[in-house]
Amino acid sequence: MKSLKLPPRRAVLPLVRMALREDVGRGDRTAAALAPERGRMRARIVAKARGVVAGLPVAALVFRELDPRVRFHALVRDGATVRPAMPVAEVTGPPRTLLTGERTALNFLQRMSGIATAARALVDRVRGTRARVYDTRKTAPGFRLLDKYAVRAGGAENHRMGLDDAFLVKNNHFTTARAMRLDFAGAVRRARAAARGVPLEVEVR
């Protein structure tokens, strides 16, 4: 599998902070009442099903954003295949922090691992052929960088990151092009002339 590079921290951290604000709000009442603020606790993140892991660095960032004293030790790498009951990470830190960050960290990890697992299943289906599996822009708003990273963790490939990456002429574009008195070939020529050197694709069904 190709080497994986997580999106820049400056792009991921706002998502982590948003997720923590959403979940923690004014504070974790249960953990504040029932978990000590100091001391050390070790927890393990364990796979519940066979699949492909993705998002471990993001999960680590969740805990460290809550408390820099937390130590996150990944036992596998993103892109690894895991089986049920297999430990994937160990987290050590104050009990209250671990309980507060648990759900947010797992939400990132489960979502990204689910995408990676689905991508791997499709890649496996075309293995041995010349076909390649690409993603789309149909991602959760704001989460495109992480969703597309998870696709790569599963062994598939990224298509356009955004509308400015390339031309992708689809049926809707041909519909609007007809209003400009352009046929199929004319629409393609016009798009190509608009920005030479930019990749151009035509969707077929």
Ranges and model annotations:
Residues 2-205:
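Acidic/glycine-rich phosphate/pyrophosphate-binding loops and surrounding catalytic core
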